[in-house]
Amino acid sequence: VITSGLRVIEVGKPIYTFYLPKTAGVDPATGKQLYYAYWTQSVDDNGKLTNVRCDEYITDNVSMASLSKYYHGSREPKLFGSIGSNFTIFKNIDFSFLTTYSIGGYVYDGLYSGTMNVQYAGNNWHKNAKRRWQKPGDRTDVPMLEVGGSYATSDNSLISASYFAIKNITIGYTLPKRWLGKLDIESLRIYATFDNIAMFNHMDGMDPQYNFTGNVAYSYAPSRVIAFGLDLNF
């Protein structure tokens, strides 16, 4: 078994399998994040505090949660591919499109984790922080917010990597030859092309397309581009 960061390499497991602490909700009395754990601390015969493996239990102890890791699926999708086509409408108008998709797998959204567990005053919070625990009795999936609080890197920030992206749409119009008159032009086509039009996934602002190891953080997403052009044949 080889553990590397958030993932594990193990015989019989898919590559890029996530190996992380597992959350167990939020304590409605204290607002603390709860975790499943199978490590605890005990005093040995020499009076020394040691970590001991035990039956699974639920705790808000971050140290014990960080030691107790679980398998959470892989970055690998179940299915991925693209769909595209091009065709002509009314003789002179052409239209083409290209889409890509991926179904299954997970990514760890480091930016989401950072905006839900802010370490410094003045940093931005994610909009999901509005669901946070605020008073005893609140039942929510978002723990109390603490600047500089202690949290385990857990499955809370594992997001489905499934997506559907509209990569390109191109619309063109070829002028009838009679419109070209006496110009020494065989054909003239005017077109507009739109790149990276839309992305539909499970987290606004996250782009799972180009990271194959499973970590999404400070990386550039493809820019949306609109271009116009002419195709001339003489």
Which residues make up each language-model segment?
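Outer-membrane beta-barrel translocator domains and adjoining extracellular loop/strand segments
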Residues: 1-2, 108-114, 203-208
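Conserved small-residue
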Residues: 1-75
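C-terminal beta-signal and terminal closure region of outer-membrane beta-barrel proteins
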Residues: 4-32, 129-130, 135-137, 151, ...
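Residues that define the transmembrane beta-barrel architecture of outer-membrane proteins
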Residues: 77-81, 162-167, 222-226
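Transmembrane beta-strands of outer-membrane beta-barrel proteins
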Residues: 83, 95-97, 188-192, 228
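Transmembrane beta-barrel domains of outer membrane proteins
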Residues: 84-88, 172-176, 231-233
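Repeated loop/turn-to-beta-strand initiation elements of outer-membrane beta-barrel proteins
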Residues: 92-95, 178-179
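Extracytoplasmic gating/loop element in the C-terminal half of outer-membrane beta-barrel translocons
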Residues: 102-190, 194
